[in-house]
């Protein structure tokens, strides 16, 4: 399928979605958010289901068959999404501190302190990594950690400049394209020792919420294809 055909298909699906009034159904936005969270954590190894997350989020009922770490991962990501949506609603500018704050929420109960030759940092506080990381065991190395602060600042400046242009347009395709680009760029920079995938998908959805778009969901069944697309 050509790019033009893909664009036409996307626009047609969006029109159909609006015509059906799906987003106006009772609690639709809440349950869609729960689904985003469930699939995002599943890509990172969580086995908590959407039904289990609904019980956990709404009633505080934990799933006996799931580990505490898995459930905390989901609760933390929910808190991060809720904060992200507040920021998106008021069109807050991107900044390194804003991203670190969201990362701190993502990693609040599953992160920890690291001591390295270059110093100590705490991933549960959203602090940037001070060590090298690779894409899995034996995979290629991500950006040198010394370059991360400047690259992250550059990333924020670029996203802000593009956001401000697009907020005043009806260009749905360019808005989606920026959200996907932000996802890819943040994964490439890999600012944190852990939680980069969840943060990249959160930032993608953050921009989509801000632009009034339907948030993109990376489903767990597409995990292998999704990871390969990031590598390619």
Residues covered by each model-derived region:
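FIC/Doc superfamily catalytic core
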Residues: 1-194, 198-232
């Amino acid at each position: 399928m050509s790019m033009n055909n893909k664009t036409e298909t996307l626009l047609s699906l969006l029109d159909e979605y609006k015509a059906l009034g799906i987003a106006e159904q009772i609690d639709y936005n809440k349950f869609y958010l729960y689904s985003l969270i469930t699939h995002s954590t599943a890509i990172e190894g969580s086995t908590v289901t959407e039904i289990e997350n609904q019980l956990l989020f709404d009633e505080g009922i934990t799933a006996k068959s799931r580990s505490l770490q898995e459930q905390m991962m989901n609760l933390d990501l929910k808190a991060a999404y809720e904060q992200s949506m507040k920021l998106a609603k008021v069109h807050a500018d991107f900044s390194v501190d804003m991203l670190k704050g969201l990362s701190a929420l993502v990693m609040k109960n599953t992160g920890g302190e690291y001591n390295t030759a270059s110093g100590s940092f705490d991933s549960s506080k959203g602090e940037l990594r001070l060590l090298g990381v690779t894409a899995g065991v034996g995979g290629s190395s991500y950006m040198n950690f010394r370059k991360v602060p400047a690259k992250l600042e550059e990333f924020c400046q670029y996203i802000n400049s593009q956001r401000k242009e697009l907020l005043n347009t009806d260009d749905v395709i360019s808005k989606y394209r920026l959200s996907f680009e932000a996802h890819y760029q943040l994964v490439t920079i890999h600012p944190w020792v852990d939680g980069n995938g969840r943060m990249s998908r959160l930032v993608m959805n953050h921009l989509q919420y801000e632009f009034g778009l339907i948030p993109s969901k990376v489903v767990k069944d597409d995990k292998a294809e999704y990871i390969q697309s990031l590598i390619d």
